[in-house]
């Protein structure tokens, strides 16, 4: 059995998708059983992979490391001190062939694993796991079906604010240049982790832009890039809507 014990703590929702898929890909490559933390696991980054997806192939929920706690899950260094369980982190941000080929049963995966090379060989199974539950998918389809032409425009702020040196926030000039690739009459759905900020920007006053400011938020606070703590937006509906649109204007992010 292998797992990803810090799933939901080591990065936000987009990171969790890659981490889950990489865990599954490594397990399939070696013929291992695999597990992920249960739905009610308390984390520091809004654990949510159970909520929107069917996860058809999930069989085991739990942890590879014993005696875990939210404090132990907070960092890779902390989790290494729990016990003798091997905790294995990728060597860099590129595909780690050595990790992929030599991952031992009974180990715990860590890192961001942001490349499809970890799970390309089981792509269809990953797509099946990430099918949206009907209570999320159907309202989104009904909304999108109202429009003959609709694309989404992604505004990523959140924990990037205050860390622009290495997580740049794109300018309105970028969005202007990107919009030139689409018809003038296309509707533009604004998908963002900061709808309140977007609502204050005159850029989005045009009727072509569709912006929902009544977005559900997580109950607990999450640390932002500027050092403040906020209730961050639940991203499931936006992700589902984006998957149904006919085109995209992306901002730099894991989901982008």
Model region roles, listed by residue range:
Residues 1-7, 135-140, 221:
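Short amphipathic alpha-helical segments and their helix-coil junctions
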Residues 22-26, 174-181, 241:
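Amphipathic alpha-helical segments that form well-ordered structural scaffolds
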Residues 10-11, 39-44, 114-115, 156-160, ...:
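Short, solvent-exposed loop/turn segments at secondary-structure junctions
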Residues 1-8, 33-37, 107-111, 148-162, ...:
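Short hydrophobic beta-strand segments
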Residues 1-46:
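N-terminal pre-catalytic "stem/leader" segment of glycosyltransferase-like enzymes
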Residues 13, 183-256:
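Donor-binding and catalytic core of enzymes assembling or modifying cell-surface/extracellular glycoconjugates
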Residues 15-18, 22, 171-174, 255:
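Conserved alpha-helical elements of sugar-nucleotide-dependent glycosyltransferases
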Residues 43-185:
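Secretory-pathway luminal glycosyltransferase catalytic domains
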């Amino acid at each position: 059995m292998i797992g990803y014990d810090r799933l939901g703590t080591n990065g936000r929702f987009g990171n969790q998708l890659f981490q889950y898929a990489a865990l599954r890909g490594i397990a399939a490559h070696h013929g291992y059983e695999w597990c992920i933390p249960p739905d009610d696991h308390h984390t520091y980054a809004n654990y949510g992979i159970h909520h929107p997806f069917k996860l058809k192939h999930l069989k085991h929920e739990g942890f590879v490391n014993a005696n875990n706690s939210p404090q132990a899950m907070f960092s890779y260094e902390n989790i290494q001190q729990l016990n003798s369980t091997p905790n294995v982190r990728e060597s860099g941000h590129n595909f780690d062939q050595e990790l992929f080929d030599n991952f031992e049963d009974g180990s715990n995966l860590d890192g961001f694993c942001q490349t499809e090379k970890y799970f390309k060989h089981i792509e269809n199974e990953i797509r099946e796991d990430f099918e949206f539950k009907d209570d999320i998918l159907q309202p989104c389809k009904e909304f999108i079906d109202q429009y003959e032409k609709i694309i989404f425009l992604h505004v990523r702020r959140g924990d990037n604010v205050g860390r622009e040196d290495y997580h740049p926030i794109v300018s309105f000039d970028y969005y202007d240049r990107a919009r030139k690739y689409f018809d003038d009459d296309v509707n533009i759905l604004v998908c963002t982790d900061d709808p309140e900020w977007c609502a204050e920007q005159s850029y989005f006053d045009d009727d072509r832009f569709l912006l929902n400011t009544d977005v559900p938020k997580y109950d607990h606070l999450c640390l932002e890039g500027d050092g403040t703590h906020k209730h961050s937006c639940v991203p499931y509906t936006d992700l589902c809507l984006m998957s149904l649109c006919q085109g995209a204007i992306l901002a730099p992010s894991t989901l982008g």
